[in-house]
């Protein structure tokens, strides 16, 4: 993802070609025809100065969304045995309507391994996810605090400037804020409001 003046980029092309992954980095897209482009070699002159950084910024914003989708989907699988737990009916949580449908003790690491082998959601990120789950199925050692390095924010700002809706990318960034406790005040305020209008006492979390 390169930005710069045409003649400068052309002069540096041998360098870019040398460090790029090359055509063997991935099979050729079946619907492409004609001679190959530099994109098929793994590099591309995207436009004037700044264009390469802009493309990389959006690439990383998309990465946030993909990572969030994997995490959320695998969490649904992880919780698929919730019907086996004793269900408490109270004002805090609506009862599980059909607990018999949620009796699955699923092997999430094995499912991730399965999906990375020819599934429509296969990707390098899923390869890494499967590796992480193989190393630590319960993800011990991870507290769930997720940093953001800036590209997600910049992508969303660009989308706002362009008038382009990016709800998935926005939600994935906000989830990272939540993971760091940035929603704690709002959550406490919600709990306080429930107590004010309905007298709902906050339930103490198990193990607290």
Segments the model singles out, each with a brief description of its role:
Residues 1-5:
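Short beta-strand-to-turn element immediately C-terminal to the catalytic PLP-Schiff-base lysine
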């Amino acid at each position: 993802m390169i930005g710069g003046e045409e003649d400068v980029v052309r002069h540096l092309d041998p360098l870019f070609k040398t460090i790029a992954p090359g055509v063997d980095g991935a099979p050729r897209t079946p619907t492409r025809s004609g001679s190959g482009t530099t994109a098929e070699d793994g590099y591309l002159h995207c436009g004037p100065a700044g264009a390469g950084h802009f493309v990389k910024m959006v690439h990383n914003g998309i990465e946030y969304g993909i990572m969030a989708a994997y995490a959320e989907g695998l969490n649904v699988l992880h919780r698929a045995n919730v019907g086996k737990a004793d269900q408490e009916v109270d004002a805090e949580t609506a009862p599980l309507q059909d607990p018999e449908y949620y009796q699955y003790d699923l092997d999430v690491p094995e499912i991730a391994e399965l999906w990375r082998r020819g599934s429509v959601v296969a990707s390098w990120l899923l390869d890494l996810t499967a590796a992480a789950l193989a190393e630590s199925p319960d993800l011990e050692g991870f507290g769930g605090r997720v940093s953001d390095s800036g590209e997600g924010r910049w992508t969303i700002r660009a989308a706002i400037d362009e008038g382009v809706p990016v709800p998935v990318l926005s939600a994935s960034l906000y989830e990272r804020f939540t993971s760091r406790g940035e929603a704690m005040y709002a959550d406490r305020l919600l709990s306080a409001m429930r107590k004010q209008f309905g007298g709902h006492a906050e339930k103490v979390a198990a193990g607290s």
